[in-house]
């Protein structure tokens, strides 16, 4: 949720952010109007309450007919107070509903436009060439080495489901373990998170549970399957006051993730690039507003460290405003080269959500003024970033393949596979 005080004082900044996202600017003026109505209703209520208190004292001192007359006025005034209270509550509700429709304020420097308007920050490594043989795609390789079974996945669960078996299962577990160990070495607390969450937790992270077609819902229990452990990790400290005296609070969550892929009909139908269920290690950070940008760069560096360990050529892109999720003020994606597609495909993303999620989830820290004196509380900043996920297998199999379909294991991964140097053809 955005800061209504900031919006009221700097409406042009929020209009510009909405324009950059391709979103409706008029909501900014609607919120300002709703805030004015809320303030007016609250003032009316408080004035009537004060008047009610005065009448209460008069009634206590009055006698006889005067007291009866005053009691009649008090009753009428009580009805007015009740109506004013309802009006103030309604104005507050309307304002909150409008605020929940506004995505996070975009950071300065984020590219304007949509999905194709990203800016390439840097490119690392060179896409592999195959002068001696025609490269196979990840599914063909996966079938040759007994790693991926899409046919039985579809038989058991439907389209976009799969089995990882044998070296495929081992490879995913190795990736996730390497990612988790790296996170722990960087000071993250490892977490195994719930994959079902309450609607208030899902909404708190910025998802629209009523209109988001990507989310699986268990209607009888009113619970939602998460598409990332970010959701559970964001809700972990809901309604709490955090202490950053020892620095940022960093968690690394491992979980299964679920996405309906409702808008992906016909896209990436072959293999495991776009699936309904996958596993992931997600980094999540709580920190101060002042430290958020620096933490964002650290998250990106940790993601790049994993890509380097996997010996994959990749690029980093600064995602355009119109392609940002509601919660993100800025997002960087790391995309690895997929040889048979002749394209870079996203393997990781990292987002700075500033105070957006924390305001929705009521996560705060104790504030101090310039003299170090306590001054109430304020919203914290939250950030997230992917460290490893099932999709990495796509790039690993294709980039490190041999002519016969076997796959060389990157050196850093070998110890997590019992020293295995090559994934052999069966």
UniProtKB/Swiss-Prot annotation:
L-serine binds at residues 228-230, 282, 386. GO terms for cellular component: cytoplasm. Residues 1-22 are annotated as: Disordered. Transmembrane segments: none annotated. Its EC number is 6.1.1.11. This is Serine--tRNA ligase. One of its GO terms (biological process) is seryl-tRNA aminoacylation. It is found in: Cytoplasm. Pathway: Aminoacyl-tRNA biosynthesis; selenocysteinyl-tRNA(Sec) biosynthesis; L-seryl-tRNA(Sec) from L-serine and tRNA(Sec): step 1/1. One of its GO terms (molecular function) is ATP binding. Residues 1-15 have a biased composition (Basic and acidic residues). It comes from Pseudarthrobacter chlorophenolicus (strain ATCC 700700 / DSM 12829 / CIP 107037 / JCM 12360 / KCTC 9906 / NCIMB 13794 / A6). Belongs to the class-II aminoacyl-tRNA synthetase family. Type-1 seryl-tRNA synthetase subfamily. ATP binds at residues 259-261, 275, 346-349. It is an enzyme of class 6 (ligase). Homodimer. The tRNA molecule binds across the dimer. HAMAP family: Ser_tRNA_synth_type1 (MF_00176). InterPro entries: aa-tRNA-synt_IIb (IPR002314), aa-tRNA-synth_II (IPR006195), aa-tRNA-synth_II/BPL/LPL (IPR045864), Ser-tRNA-ligase_type_1 (IPR002317), Ser-tRNA-synth_1_N (IPR015866), SerRS_1_N_sf (IPR042103), SerRS_core (IPR033729), tRNA-bd_arm (IPR010978). It catalyses: tRNA(Ser) + L-serine + ATP = L-seryl-tRNA(Ser) + AMP + diphosphate + H(+); tRNA(Sec) + L-serine + ATP = L-seryl-tRNA(Sec) + AMP + diphosphate + H(+).
